[in-house]
Amino acid sequence: MLFRSAIHGGIYRARPEVNAVVHNHSTALIPFGVTGMPLRAIFHMGAVIGSEVPIWDSRPEFGDTNLLVTDHEKGRSLAAALGARRAALMRGHGSVVVGATLPIALGRTIYLDHNARLQAQALQLADDPDEVVYLDDEEVQALSWQAYARSWELWQTQWKPRLAAEAALRPIPPSA
């Protein structure tokens, strides 16, 4: 698909150490991408998102668009906004998350979503946004080494039956 290849291709060209890119449309992330509220690590597993999650906005560079990364120029622009970071929000669209392996990229994606939900809840509870306590850079560095071997096995166990059930509902294409 052109859209995914532009996103993934731009990042793979810019980041040779990346072997997995996850693009998603998490509704928990959209508010952070459209308000400019920084998405910051708020709990121990949130450290996997790193110290900064930039927001890529296509409008300044490309004018009014449909918010989709439809060509390689936009893919390169998104990759530049991501830089050396682990994730980037896409204004009004979703996010991209990267990793050296699929389990790492998927783990970061899941915990990015969890972190966004927790941060939004904390901001709602706080009388003043400055009352919310985030992880500092040292805590992020101390925690971000976490691997996903155990989580990956659990996610596979949980998702394989669901994916198999969905596959069973799809019609089998006729033989040529």
Model-derived features: where do they sit?
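Glycine-rich flexible loops
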Residues: 1-176
